[in-house]
Regions:
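Vicinal oxygen chelate
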Residues: 14-16, 68-113
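Conserved catalytic-core motifs of GNAT/GCN5-like acyltransferases
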Residues: 9-11, 29-37, 95, 121-123
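A short acidic/small-residue loop/turn micro-motif
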Residues: 61, 98, 119-123
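Conserved acetyl-CoA-binding loop of GNAT-fold acetyltransferases
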Residues: 24-30, 86-88
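Structural motif
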Residues: 21, 25-26, 109
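Conserved short beta-strand elements that form part of the metal-binding/catalytic scaffold
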Residues: 30-66, 113-118
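Short hydrophobic/aromatic beta-strand element in the GNAT-like acyltransferase core
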Residues: 9, 43, 52, 103-105
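N-terminal beta-strand motif that seeds the catalytic metal site of vicinal oxygen chelate
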Residues: 1-19, 66-68, 119-123
């Protein structure tokens, strides 16, 4: 048996706001979207490289305010990329975490947080 990486489900309230944040700003792509019928809440999968997230407008799927920890090998490159795309609500910086890593944290319009983490060499 082989376990695969988990796929976090994040609560969203507006598909257009979610797309603006995850696709237009963070650089994810929409892999697919599902609605049980026209006008029903959306459930979609977004991905960037190996990172896959599910975004749900469905009440009861999950609660807003989740935090997802994403490993990366170059937080500074991500910071430059995000800084090149205007976002009036987010201007994240790069910090050094107590666990000896460079981190960049962003918060989506629904209160969910993504923490991008780059471990630093041991001192």
């Amino acid at each position: 048996m082989t376990l695969q990486p988990p796929i976090p489900v994040l609560r969203i309230f507006d598909r257009a706001l979610a797309k603006a944040f995850y696709v237009d700003w963070l650089g994810f792509r929409v892999d697919w979207e599902h609605r049980f019928e026209p006008g029903a809440p959306a459930y979609l999968q977004v991905a960037r490289g190996p990172v896959v997230l599910h975004l749900s407008e469905h009440y009861g799927d999950c609660s807003p305010g989740a935090k997802v920890f994403v490993h990366t090998d170059d937080v500074e490159a991500l910071h430059r990329e995000l800084s090149s795309r205007p976002n009036r609500n987010m201007r994240p910086g790069v910090d050094i975490a107590p666990w000896n890593a460079k981190v960049l944290e962003v918060t989506d319009p629904f209160g969910n947080r993504l923490l991008f983490n780059q471990p630093l060499p041991a001192a």
